[in-house]
């Protein structure tokens, strides 16, 4: 570790010591989501299950609530409920990452943990340079940087980042999000026999592949894995135009299902499907744990989307992760469900049956800033709605076959909405934290995630219907 690296870490810890008490005094501070101690959190990085613990690294800017030269922060857990903050994993201290240790991934080999990340560099004229870098650890806590292992191939701009690494039949592969020189987004592949020397194989898909036309000017945060006999590519394309209810956020995150031919190499796949229908979801990354489960974490925000309006900025922090979600395939569709381990947080269970007929009433929610609500056995003539703390509303419009999530904008000046189409509604599973809501529809067929910032004194959660609606409701306080 260089003297400059030590100095950056010292300054970051000093910032935490100075500002974390202010951050923790914020009524919007989350109770059961990963968030930064201070400063800005964005993409989950290096998510991995290793030696009995889940590791989630994250993009972290400790000195401000705007983006800048990123560190890698680090949390671990053994039960996916109680998270421990570990020491800083990476600091932007070397010539190859001096403007940020950008996103990447983790793998294990010979009982060591290998972190791959993008070193972001600006030259003296402000021009971007990009390097794919490696750091290695014996204990999973302290990492030794090994420097650059892959450089920019011809035909691409320096928007070339976010390596995700895995092993297949004795060879290591790395997928990277890329932008071609003619400003088209692609996912490209490298291969290695030893994790330190990488050869460029070429693009596997992108704009102009598999029937895709112009499909964004940049693809970020690719993740490629096998699931139930198919290959799944998760990616966050930038530059998609809104299309009906689709692509409503500034940038998108979604997936393709298909088959990767490692010899060509080429990914043959179907259409792109968004992972989350809500307001705040980006840069997802997955791991496989010791039970063989494919688990996803994502950043509960979108770059360049109202970030400056978050009220938490006044308390020196911004952003959080989604809850971890287990992924399964149903045909060509990814199903996302909250991990069963989260049930360990449940306290004060209430089970009720509600029957509404052109009426409304408050649900017996004790702590709406830390609550789980499960609606089951739903029967409704025309639909119903759930209003959450006067700031967000979930509604089902049966005739149109649409579910809607509305919220007050962060500046409080307007109401915003996101919609998705469903054939029928059987279950609604809500997780309400101090400043977020995640809603799983029909056991994870669709998910809507959003940050929201209710008035701390408003604790009311109400259900209403214009026609006849009845359902069974489970409510838990989450501790």
UniProtKB/Swiss-Prot annotation:
Binding site residues for substrate: 40-43, 59, 102-103, 161-162, 220
Annotated stretches, region: Disordered: 1-28
Gene3D superfamilies: Exo-inulinase, domain 1, Glycosyl hydrolase domain, family 43
Enzyme Commission no: 3.2.1.26
GO cellular component terms listed in the entry, alphabetical order: cytoplasm
GO terms classed as biological process: sucrose metabolic process
Active site residues per record: 43
InterPro entries xrefs: ConA-like_dom_sf (IPR013320), GH32_Enzymes (IPR051214), Glyco_hydro_32 (IPR001362), Glyco_hydro_32_AS (IPR018053), Glyco_hydro_32_C (IPR013189), Glyco_hydro_32_N (IPR013148), Glyco_hydro_beta-prop_sf (IPR023296), Suc6P_hydrolase (IPR006232)
CDD domains: GH32_ScrB-like
Catalytic activity: Hydrolysis of terminal non-reducing beta-D-fructofuranoside residues in beta-D-fructofuranosides
Induction record: Induced by sucrose. Expression is regulated by the antiterminator SacT.
GO molecular function terms attached to this record: beta-fructofuranosidase activity
UniProt keyword list: Carbohydrate metabolism, Glycosidase, Hydrolase
SMART domains assigned to the protein according to its UniProt record, in alphabetical order: Glyco_32
Pfam families: Glyco_hydro_32C, Glyco_hydro_32N
Pathway assigned to this chain's UniProt record: Glycan biosynthesis; sucrose metabolism
Tagged with keyword Hydrolase: yes
Family statement drawn from the similarity comment of this UniProt entry: Belongs to the glycosyl hydrolase 32 family.
PANTHER family according to UniProt: BETA-FRUCTOSIDASE
Record-given protein name: Sucrose-6-phosphate hydrolase
Species per Swiss-Prot/TrEMBL record: Bacillus subtilis (strain 168)
Taxonomic lineage of the native organism: Bacteria, Bacillati, Bacillota, Bacilli, Bacillales
């Amino acid at each position: 570790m260089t003297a400059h690296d030590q100095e950056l870490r010292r300054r970051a810890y000093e910032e935490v010591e100075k500002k974390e008490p202010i951050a923790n005094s914020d009524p919007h501070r989350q109770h059961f989501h990963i968030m930064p101690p201070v400063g800005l959190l964005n993409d989950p990085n290096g998510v991995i299950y290793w030696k009995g613990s889940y590791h989630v690294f994250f993009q972290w800017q400790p000195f401000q609530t705007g983006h800048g030269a990123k560190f890698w922060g680090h949390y671990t857990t053994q039960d996916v409920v109680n998270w421990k903050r570990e020491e800083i994993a990476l600091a932007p201290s070397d010539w190859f990452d001096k403007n940020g240790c950008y996103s990447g991934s983790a793998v294990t080999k010979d009982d060591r943990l290998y972190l791959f990340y993008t070193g972001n560099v600006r030259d003296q004229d402000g021009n971007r340079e990009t390097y794919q870098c490696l750091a290695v650890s014996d204990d999973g806590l302290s990492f030794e940087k090994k420097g650059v292992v892959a450089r920019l191939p011809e035909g691409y701009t320096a928007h070339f980042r976010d390596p995700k690494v895995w092993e297949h039949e004795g060879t290591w592969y790395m997928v990277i999000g890329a932008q071609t020189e003619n400003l088209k987004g692609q996912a490209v592949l490298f291969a290695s026999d030893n994790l330190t020397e990488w050869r460029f194989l070429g693009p596997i898909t992108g704009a102009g592949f598999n029937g895709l036309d112009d499909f964004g000017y940049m693809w970020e945060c690719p993740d490629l894995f096998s699931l139930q006999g198919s290959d799944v590519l998760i990616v966050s394309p930038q530059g998609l135009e809104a299309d009906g209810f689709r692509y409503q956020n500034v940038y998108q995150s979604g997936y393709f299902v298909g088959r990767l031919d490692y010899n060509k190499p080429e990914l043959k796949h179907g259409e792109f499907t968004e992972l989350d229908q809500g307001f705040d979801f980006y840069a997802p990354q997955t791991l496989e744990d010791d039970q063989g489960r494919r688990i996803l974490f994502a950043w509960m925000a979108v770059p360049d989307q109202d970030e400056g309006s978050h009220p938490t900025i006044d308390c020196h922090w911004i952003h959080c992760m989604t809850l971890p979600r287990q992924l399964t395939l149903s045909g060509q569709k990814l199903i996302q469900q909250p991990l069963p381990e989260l049930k360990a947080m449940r306290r004060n269970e209430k089970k009720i049956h509600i029957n509404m007929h052109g009426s409304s009433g408050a649900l017996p929610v004790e702590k709406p800033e830390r609550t789980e609500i499960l609606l089951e056995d739903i029967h409704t003539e025309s639909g119903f709605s759930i209003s959450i703390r006067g700031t967000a509303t979930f509604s089902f419009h049966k005739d149109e076959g649409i579910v809607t999530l509305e919220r007050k904008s962060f500046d409080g000046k307007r109401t915003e909405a996101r919609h998705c189409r469903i054939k029928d509604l059987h279950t609604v599973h809500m997780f309400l934290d101090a400043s977020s809501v995640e809603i799983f529809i029909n056991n994870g067929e669709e998910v809507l995630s959003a940050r929201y910032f209710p008035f701390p004194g408003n604790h009311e959660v109400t259900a209403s219907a214009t026609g006849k609606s009845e359902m069974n409701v489970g409510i838990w306080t989450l501790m």
